[in-house]
Amino acid sequence: MYIQNLTLSSYRNYERLDLQFENKVNVIIGENAQGKTNLMEAIYVLAMAKSHRTSNDKELIRWDEDYAKIEGRVIKKNGSVPIQLVISKKGKKGKVNHIEQQKLSQYVGAVNTIMFAPEDLNLVKGSPQVRRRFLDMEIGQVSPVYLHDLSLYQKILSQRNHFLKQLQTRKQTDQTMLDVLTEQLTEFAAKVVMKRLQFVDQLEKWAQPIHSGISRGLEELTLKYHTSLHVSDSPDLSKMINSYQETFSKLRDKEIERGVSLSGPHRDDVLFYVNGRDVQTYGSQGQQRTTALSLKLAEIDLIQEEIGEYPILLLDDVLSELDDYRQSHLLHTIQGRVQTFVTTTSVDGIDHKTLNEAEIFRVENGTLSD
């Protein structure tokens, strides 16, 4: 798939912007604070209905405007699909093929993107929350069911934590409601973890040969989904639900004492190993960056396998963070396969056939020229 055109209205520093794109590498050159990253973010928000930079949607709306609008036309195997996202201070509304989607979980997935920005290099060495968010965002764009289950899990988790806090402060003494909420929570916790386990297995399958190639065959990358549950090699949903029920039963007194849920996918993590050693703790910066790059490139094939089409790749100021060898490997991997958007302050020193054949745009003060 690829984006054929993009229109921004009152988005960040863009009053109005209309762009046409080719199904190739599109390089956006400009100094810092001119609008390069805002443009990349707009494509990502159009796809994911949320920003990778902020959780405050009001920041996406141009100063003194009531709403921002992002429109695009995506070309897929089965035809052309117009999509639109309107961001107001009251919320977001998305349209696919001119039809308004009742829920954003139904909207997400109309266009698939992979964002690789400098902060993604923290995927390995950052906090577990960073990796959980990575899982949720990437699984969500290929599985609307996952987004639905995750949303319900988070809603019930919030209700359960609120009730535990009431039990802790003795504003409530009857634990019947806790039993009801726990039963509901275990079902959706198990569904979320099952999908995450499946995704991590698939990601490892695609990331291993990429990592091996970058490391010239010297390193083997393995991934492990870390959860408080005992997970068998072939997990079963009903067994996982039972396991959660047993876990919450054992933790009940401690949870009431602390006023918070102490188990579930909101506390899980993904661990990365190179040649059997934990990369986060023992890996060099080079190994950590190779791991992050391998994971991002693996997503290209994983999404293609899931939906039958390649996603759109967004490389936001990330080339400058990679050495020449990793730059070359990245550009070689995407060559001729995926529509790619690259932002950079300069292409000087980046000598690769992919960039030489790219469409070049220049941005200054929120205005683009080619």
Swiss-Prot record:
Top-level taxon of origin: Bacteria
Entry-linked InterPro entries: DNA-binding_RecF, DNA-binding_RecF_CS, P-loop_NTPase, RecF/RecN/SMC_N, RecF_2
Chief location: cytoplasm
Entry's localization field: Cytoplasm
Keywords: ATP-binding, Cytoplasm, DNA damage, DNA repair, DNA replication, DNA-binding, Nucleotide-binding, SOS response
GO molecular function, one term: ATP binding
GO BP, sorted A to Z: DNA replication; DNA synthesis involved in DNA repair; double-strand break repair; SOS response
Keyword match DNA-binding: yes
Pfam family, one: SMC_N
Residues the entry annotates as binding ATP: G30, E31, N32, A33, Q34, G35, K36, T37
GO cellular component: cytoplasm
Coiled coil location: none
NCBIfam families (UniProt xref): recf (TIGR00611)
Family recorded in the similarity comment: Belongs to the RecF family.
Entry-linked HAMAP family: RecF
Role played: The RecF protein is involved in DNA metabolism; it is required for DNA replication and normal SOS inducibility. RecF binds preferentially to single-stranded, linear DNA. It also seems to bind ATP.
Listed name of the protein: DNA replication and repair protein RecF
Natural source organism: Bacillus licheniformis (strain ATCC 14580 / DSM 13 / JCM 2505 / CCUG 7422 / NBRC 12200 / NCIMB 9375 / NCTC 10341 / NRRL NRS-1264 / Gibson 46)
